[in-house]
Curated annotation (Swiss-Prot):
InterPro entries: Nudix_hydrolase, NUDIX_hydrolase-like_dom_sf, NUDIX_hydrolase_CS, NUDIX_hydrolase_dom, RppH. This is RNA pyrophosphohydrolase. The keyword Membrane does not apply. It holds the Pfam family NUDIX. Accelerates the degradation of transcripts by removing pyrophosphate from the 5'-end of triphosphorylated RNA, leading to a more labile monophosphorylated state that can stimulate subsequent ribonuclease cleavage. Belongs to the Nudix hydrolase family. RppH subfamily. PANTHER family: NUDIX HYDROLASE 26, CHLOROPLASTIC, UDP/ADP-SUGAR PYROPHOSPHATASE. Keywords: Hydrolase. Its EC number is 3.6.1.-. It comes from Wolbachia pipientis wMel.
Length: 162
């Protein structure tokens, strides 16, 4: 399938993992069923890593991280048809994301999902990477599978060497 690349909002995603190799996930306010990793749009003129660190601070409330790597390619997903008019005034049919793998170097107390006063998440937890896909909303499951496939060996190597 050929995608119309300009119909996808440029975005970054962050897989933040702790010393145990578990990933940070948050439960959004509009859902009681789905959890997600931090993500957000790239501002005009903003470098991707800069956007990822900004989004992490805004959504997770910490900068106590080490950037390990980023995904080799953009990862695309489509929004469900009924959601397109609601998100970004129908300008985009989905998102294209570059994912960053970051190691959390702080303590749980260093995480503050209310950091901005306008939180994205109502609660958070660390979750094993093998069960992340099951916690995600349906249209993001393939993205999470791709991210896990690309980053899981790096996470395992990092937790062994810590």
């Amino acid at each position: 399938m050929v995608e119309q690349k300009d119909k996808y909002r440029p975005c970054v995603g962050i897989m933040l993992f702790n010393r145990q190799g578990h990933a940070f996930i948050g439960k959004r306010f509009e859902s009681d069923s789905y959890w997600q990793m931090p993500q957000g749009g790239v501002d005009d003129g903003e470098e991707l890593e800069q956007a990822a660190l900004r989004e992490l601070l805004e959504e997770v409330g910490t900068n106590k991280v080490k950037v390990i790597t980023k995904s080799k390619d953009w990862i695309y997903y489509n929004l469900p048809e009924e959601v397109i008019p609601i998100c970004w005034n129908g300008k985009y049919s989905g998102q294209k994301q570059r994912w960053f793998l970051m190691k959390f170097c702080g303590e749980d107390e260093d995480i503050d999902i209310n950091y901005t006063g306008h939180p994205e998440f109502k609660e958070w937890r660390w979750q094993g990477i093998d069960s992340l896909v099951a916690s995600a909303i349906s249209f993001k499951k393939e993205v999470y599978k791709t991210v896990i496939e690309e980053f899981s060996s790096i996470i395992k190597a990092s937790t062994i060497s810590s």
